[in-house]
Amino acid sequence: TIEAEENQTLLEKLNREELINTMQFLQRCAAQAGYYYNLQAPGSEFGTMKLQTAENDDPIVAQVKIWDNKEHKIRTRFSLRRLVTEEDGSLSVKLPCGSYEAEVTCGPEYSTVLVPFEITKDKVTTIKARLARIAHLTDHGWTAGDLHHHSIYSSPAYGGTDPVIETPGQVCRSMKSLGMQFGALSDHHNVLNHEEWQRQNNNFTPIISKEISTSNGH
């Protein structure tokens, strides 16, 4: 078909490095959607982990790092998954069966919570993480933010070159999970993110911007 011929033509145009970059981009897209694979363990059995984070009784956006306990403790090398909860503090991810540990954080103003858990075939494991505030930096005149970040609008899907798959909303939650109160989303050569970025104003100050890159660099 025409579509198949177009795909074949695209593959023929890609060199080795471009093909690898494309495969890595697609792998990140799958990971963002909660799908993972392990080439060394085909046919692995999976279960689901559901997490709820809170400060006191209020949900909080948090960063969650997950690693395999066995790999971490025995082999000294491990596969780390870095995820971010939704605005309501929830997270759901499918994982191969086994023993894991989750590290839940929300920047330097909050405690770090470590939660061990087990994944069983076709079962849902529910865990909770209550974060305690240990500092109030804004009381001392300090605020945190990121003035250089990109979203999917800088990716090949929109004519860019950066292997980024996060939407503006996901970028905002990522910043908030690190304890930031403001941020600039500076995609390359376009303002496609501006409308969506300006809506990310729940306990956050979005700054619209654009990055111009020339043949000589930034």
What are these regions (language model features)?
Residues 97-107:
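A short, solvent-exposed beta-strand micro-motif common in secreted/extracellular proteins
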Residues 63-95:
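Short, acidic Ser/Thr/Gly-rich low-complexity loop/linker segments typical of extracellular
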Residues 6-39:
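A general sequence property marking short-to-moderate contiguous segments
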Residues 96-97, 121:
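Surface-exposed loops/turns
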Residues 26, 32-42, 118-137:
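Extracellular beta-sheet/turn segments enriched in Thr/Pro/Gly and aliphatic residues
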Residues 47-56, 64, 129:
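A short, amphipathic beta-strand motif
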Residues 135-218:
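A metal-dependent hydrolase metal-coordination microenvironment
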Residues 83-87, 108-126:
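Structured interaction patches on ligand/partner-binding surfaces of diverse proteins
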